[in-house]
Amino acid sequence: MSTNNMDRFEFRCIRPEETPQAIEIEQICFPPNEACSPKSLTERIKATAETFLVAEDKETGKLAAFLNGVPTDEDAFRDEFFTDISLINPEGKNIMLLGLDVRPEYRMQGLGRELVSRYGQREAQKGRKKLFLTCLDEKVKMYEKFGFTDLGQANSTWGGETWHAMSIEIGK
């Protein structure tokens, strides 16, 4: 999607009433063993809606995609970030990205890249230093194109999978 095509979307924090849409998108984007549970996603939205960035399709009024993370002072991703909202540190220097969820009909158009870019800019303005994430082998190249560095195998067994740890500097 060109920048002009991004005008089709409103980029903003998630609203509580959009929780069912976020749960639906998560279940579409990830297999059951990898998806965040509806309970955990609901808790995270209630606790830190400001750590979500959504792309709402202005034509349909529906969420096309979202990105969410956990602010922390930690420098390594761990699986507990997915389930334990007590790990949220609103003043944390880093963000552990938990999911980039793009509905299938909006993929391959640059929307994921746009969300990551806007999210990084927003969090850098808050004084954050780095974004961290984990991804499967087949997504490493995509995140490298977004500017992330592959840090090797992650200390994660989420969903019974082997994950790559990746990071990108966003602030000074």
Predicted feature residues:
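Helix-loop element at the rim of GNAT/NAT acetyltransferase active sites that forms part
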Residues: 13, 24-37
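Residue-level recognition of the GNAT/N-acetyltransferase active site
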Residues: 15, 98, 103, 136
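Conserved GNAT acetyl-CoA-binding A-motif
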Residues: 95, 116, 122-136
